[in-house]
Amino acid sequence: MTNTKYYPEVNSNADFAGLEREILKFWQDNNIFQKSIDDRNGELEFIFYDGPPFANGLPHYGHLLTGFIKDVYARYQTIKGKKVERRFGWDCHGLPAEMQSEKELGISGRLAIANFGIEKFNAHCRASVMKYANDWEEYVTRQARWVNFKNSYKTMDKNFMESVLWAFKELYNKGLLYESMRVMPYSWACETPLSNFETRLDNSYRERADKAVTVSFVLSHPVATTTGSFKEYRILAWTTTPWTLPSNLALAVGSDIDYALVPKNDVCYIIAAYSVSKYAKELGLSGEENFEIIKGSALQGLNYKSLFDYFENHPNSFKIFAGDFVVEGDGTGVVHMAPGFGEDDQILCESKGIELVCPVDNSGKFTKEIPDLEGLQVFDANDKIIIKLKEQGNWLKTEQYIHNYPHCWRTDTPLIYKAVPSWYVKVTQFKDRMVELNQQINWIPFHVKDNLFGKWLENARDWSISRNRFWGTPLPVWKSDDPKYPRIDVYGSIEELEKDFGVKVTDLHRPFIDELTRPNPDDPTGKSTMRRIEDVFDCWFESGSMPYGQAHYPFENKEWFEDHFPADFIVEYSAQTRGWFYTLMVLSTALFDRPPFLNCICHGIILDSTGQKLSKRLNNYADPLELFDKYGSDALRVTMLSSNVVKGQELLIDKDGKMVFDTLRLFIKPIWNAYHFFTMYANTDSLKGKLNFSSKNVLDVYILSKLKIAVQKIEESLDNFDTQTAYHAVSEFFEVLNNWYIRRSRARFWKSEKDTDKQNAYNTLYSCLDTMAIAMSALVPMISEAIYKGLHHCEERNDTALSGKSNVIVRKDTSLDKAISGVSHKIATALSVPCNDAISVHLCNYPTLSDFEINHELVATMDNVLDICSNSLFIRSTENIRVRQPLASIAIISKHNNNLKDFEDLIKDEINVKAVIYRDDLENYASKKLSINFPMLGKRLPHKMKEIIAASKKGEWEAIAGGLAICGETLNSDEYKLVLEPYSHIKGAASFENNSSLLILDLELTPELIEEGYARDIVRFIQQARKDADFSITDRILIEIISEFNLSKIIDNYGDFIKEQTLGEFAKNFTPDYVSKVELENHQIQLKVKKS
């Protein structure tokens, strides 16, 4: 009779990478991704915004991490019945593209680009910006992430750019834009200003050593003093930017700070009293002197002589003012003011009628206004300035100052602060509203809402959105070129441009947009012309415009956008609280008075195993594709998303992929092992599993209850955007399925009778695998698909994805009309699994098991049984007593023994003891010890910790309702733990049931017990020989044992047991199929086996 096999022949040692490649091909050939979208009618939608990456570099582990998270929730919401569009996007404009093009073209700087030609330069940017797009698609596809590349949006597309123009004009019309010359962080390497939040992006600060100089400024008039008169009065100022001193126009002091008048020869030095000791050497002090003290307010309004003659006649300058930013700390308590190079400096000086000077050009070099430094880069000018100060007699001290200093996030060069003209969004005008709208957002981790992001919003500054660069969306601002006839025009659409300029606009980029000019309507002479300002948008403005830009709103899809805004979910690295999340929030608040998203995950950063940033230079990480080819992408997905990195913390990953291998071994392989076990025995027995939850077998009810608990836990976790807990639920379930249910049910699978009990076992295991394949499909999409396809296999194909090995021909099963044949419609509905038409696990609906009731009492009791058994096995391991060695008894000391008695035989068999003894006199064997949670309690009661520790050691405490009383305080449940501790003379003991019960193993070995243990060893040796000889599990065998060790008594007493366990008969003088040599109690044993 032919053995009918209903399932693929599954390889226990699967090639998971090869399996995944077959799954990817299956998805592509059958258009599964698009089907998963089309199958949802759109009544329920999950709106997901995919933040646009730059495509001028390869994806790194951070991109993959973000992509895995995006994919998990998109897949999950899909099987929850929602339509989830996943449109990919590309960030195309800005410095990354320009810097790459400059490098490839061999040019550098704005002047070189202008000479090369803006049209040619931008054409190169356009061509190069998508250089790695195909590589991105390969990486993203290989990581099993489903996205729509064909309909991707690009920030350089005309439609996207037009929406950006609309947003700008909307802000302008709302009065939320202004133009100003303000001091900003400035990248002289890129020749452009940066937003204040760009200097707060990850890794933008570096430790840097600068020369700090203390300079003396000569006052124009004496200071009123009681200590006598001096030839000169000098006030000391300290700065870490000596290059700004040629532009000094004022000094600032703290009005309430005490300043000392320090005499040296015929000069009186003025310095904050707190700083005098730091200058003892330079001022010739012994430390015993007393000085006259005056308040900073007494210095206000005094004039001083300019250090240099560059701006000595600058109006209203060279005075001392009070500044509330001057505080005690580093320096001298006196701040030198260069309003062209400091934000506080500019604000204070402008309030005093002092116009700024800025003698530094776009490349960070001094201009002709400083003739003896002209053409010198500002940082290179420090030494020359210090020399000049010494020559003039204004120098007092130079020191090395090590501090964290902002650097350009593109070039890694130190920034300067420099006054530049720019257009600003009046963020400060509506920042309070942003704070309010932020409360509508669910942040993961939760503390981001009011801390990392919330505090950033509270301190938001006006946002500079213009950049004097080339490759970007142009600011739609035209100005009159004649200041006699001022006029500003702002455009918000291509239609408006075409109407005013009378030409067809096909490209909004420079230089084409710059060529649009027209006569100034406000000039009666007709001589002036309206010309576009040269600036382009900060690329962060464009990425912040992504929600409406991708839809070409409001020119198209107006109703669609308004129905799909805000997003249900976005995710990025936590530094984006200063980047994309922030710009989305600014523009969404200003334009729509709504939060841009409702749920946001801020994940952490991935570092190497030593905690260093992943770097090509350090060569400290593997190419992700290599890991995929070695271990599969599911393993990397689990490694990342089950770690704390999803909660904003760091993940350290080794270059060799050991962590990923461990995930494969400890998480993926157990899932596959359960599937392999089912298919192997089901094919051997020619039985099909059915989706059925009606078995009354206690193990079946238990595992089905655990299944529903796991399914609910996964659902609850993913609803709360918590992949860590979801993965734990999967792992915990398969631990119980493999190491308890399957192992305890093996006799049911092994027996020859195809009775109801055996079918129930197959149905139960099938139901577990099928249900979990769907429930965990978002978490491990590849292996879930392979298992689901294998369980529902109904077509003839050469399909590696079903088996985990190559070239396996699987028979056609025409009888499998329904994926859940034999199950009532009621149960099928409860599972919410589409029957015949779900060719992929990702086209199913999430299982609910609503008609199956969890047996909570059974689960609690069986969990206790598991706890008893695992603790007992741990004791055996600790005492070096193998599991095959029987023990006399186990004593279970508990108040809940009645529940455990039903499982006595199971406990005896699992831990290999002869008897179970039940007791309830726990006080005779153990006592409760108090364990204090010191970090937790120390926060609340720091002053009583010493007293509480002493009392806990003496046992001076009492358990009460709702907590624990000690030293007059009531401890909360998270501040302590009561640990059940056996008395010192009790051996082989362990607590269980949350430290409320105790078990004690009898560790004494009698001769009879030892003999039975040897019999069990012999069974193991024979079973291993069967496996090594590649016998089938159903083959009957002949056995011969040859040994110097006297086994006759063991064979006489336990021969029937050995034969039953091994399907064997003892025999002699046969030609063996396999011979093995083993060792028992230091004696050699030769074992011969042969198929009978």
From Swiss-Prot:
Listed binding positions for ATP are 616
**What are the alphabetically sorted keywords of the record?**
Aminoacyl-tRNA synthetase, ATP-binding, Cytoplasm, Ligase, Metal-binding, Nucleotide-binding, Protein biosynthesis, Zinc
Q: What is known of its domains?
A: IleRS has two distinct active sites: one for aminoacylation and one for editing. The misactivated valine is translocated from the active site to the editing site, which sterically excludes the correctly activated isoleucine. The single editing site contains two valyl binding pockets, one specific for each substrate (Val-AMP or Val-tRNA(Ile)).
UniProt-recorded name of the protein:
Isoleucine--tRNA ligase
Query: Cross-referenced Gene3D superfamilies, in alphabetical order?
Result: HUPs, Isoleucyl-tRNA Synthetase, Domain 1
Mostly located where?
A: cytoplasm
Provide the cofactor list for this protein.
Zn(2+)
Q: What is the lineage of its organism?
A: Bacteria, Pseudomonadati, Pseudomonadota, Alphaproteobacteria, Rickettsiales
Family, per entry: Belongs to the class-I aminoacyl-tRNA synthetase family. IleS type 2 subfamily.
Which superkingdom does the taxonomy of this entry point to?
Bacteria
Q: Which GO terms describe its molecular function?
A: aminoacyl-tRNA deacylase activity; ATP binding; isoleucine-tRNA ligase activity; tRNA binding; zinc ion binding
* Reaction catalysis annotation: tRNA(Ile) + L-isoleucine + ATP = L-isoleucyl-tRNA(Ile) + AMP + diphosphate
For this record, an example GO cellular component is: cytoplasm
Entry-linked PANTHER family = ISOLEUCINE--TRNA LIGASE, CYTOPLASMIC (PTHR42780:SF1), SOLEUCYL-TRNA SYNTHETASE (PTHR42780)
Instruction: List the NCBIfam families.
Output: ileS
Which GO biological-process labels does this protein carry? Answer: isoleucyl-tRNA aminoacylation
Q: Which Pfam family is one of this chain's hits?
A: Anticodon_1
Q: What class of enzyme is it?
A: ligase
Subcellular localization(s) per the UniProt record = Cytoplasm
